[in-house]
Amino acid sequence: MKEMTGLHSLVSIENFIKQHKFSFIYISRPGCTVCHAVLPQLRIVLDQFPNIKLGHINADDVAEVAGRFSVFTVPVLLLFIDGTEFLREARFVHFEQLEQKLKRVYRLYEGE
């Protein structure tokens, strides 16, 4: 399963995004049952993409994340490429569609 880095402040989030060409940010809350169901599936999908780094944010611990990333519900899945948000999914995630989008983007940017 994909390794995941816990991010506990806006500074650590910004640094994570800057440090990796492909940064995937997963935002959740402990009491969110959908979040608990989505995370294992997400980690399995991301296993196919070795250069995508996964970071996790607990929105209860980093309240500023809502304003910084316009988060109105959880879970939120954000893909950043070279520091720019490229993909966003929220609440109910269609994993087949997400996987296809990731494959297209990954091939395009890995071919550079």
Curated annotation (Swiss-Prot):
> Is Disulfide bond a UniProt keyword of this protein?
yes
* Sequence ranges assigned to domain Thioredoxin in this UniProt record: 1-107
Q: Which UniProt keywords apply?
A: Disulfide bond, Redox-active center
Q: SUPFAM superfamilies this protein is in?
A: Thioredoxin-like
Q: Name one Pfam family in it.
A: Thioredoxin
The protein's name is Thioredoxin-like protein YdfQ
What's the name of its gene?
A: ydfQ
Could you read off the lineage of the organism from its UniProt record? Answer: Bacteria, Bacillati, Bacillota, Bacilli, Bacillales
Q: Spell out the InterPro entries in the cross-references.
A: Thioredoxin-like_sf (IPR036249), Thioredoxin_domain (IPR013766)
Answer whether the UniProt record assigns the keyword Zinc to this protein: no
- Superkingdom of the source species: Bacteria
Per the UniProt entry, the disulfide pairs are C32-C35
